Amino acid sequence: GESSGDCRSNLLKINACYYTPSDGVLIPTGEKRAVKNTPFDFTAQKKIGGGFNAKELLATHGYDHNYILNGEHAAHAESEVTGVKMDVFTDMPCLQFYTGGQLGGVNGKSGKYNRWAGFCLEPQFCPDSINKQDFEKPVLNKDEEKSHYIKFNFAWN
């Protein structure tokens, strides 16, 4: 929660076996890579900051990556410090996971938010999917209607 330290000690599980690697300006390359045995593997709950020293995370100072979801229970996060738990449910195809690596003294409620002051779990279409053949397109044609849902459940001890 707010003013409870940075996000690296929080626990996270993401329901995804693949992520989309990015180029030098964080645009996905169009390929899918398996998360297994990489710093991107959150298929079992683990600490967010455990892989921050991996070479794949140096450019982003942590995570700013898109995951291809396996199902509607997209993610589970919890803080061992505060006891707050969060579950994310969605019918969107992907989830962007961002750990605030680009933050640097942003003004906030309790002062400055520095790098890793929090994290985001953002259900979405795959970035640049309009230009990638194998990804669902975020296109709505004339006279079409479409809806998606995103649900965040919170609990605490």
Locations of regions flagged by a protein language model:
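An exposed, glycine/acidic-rich loop-and-rim segment of catalytic or binding clefts
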Residues: G1-N157
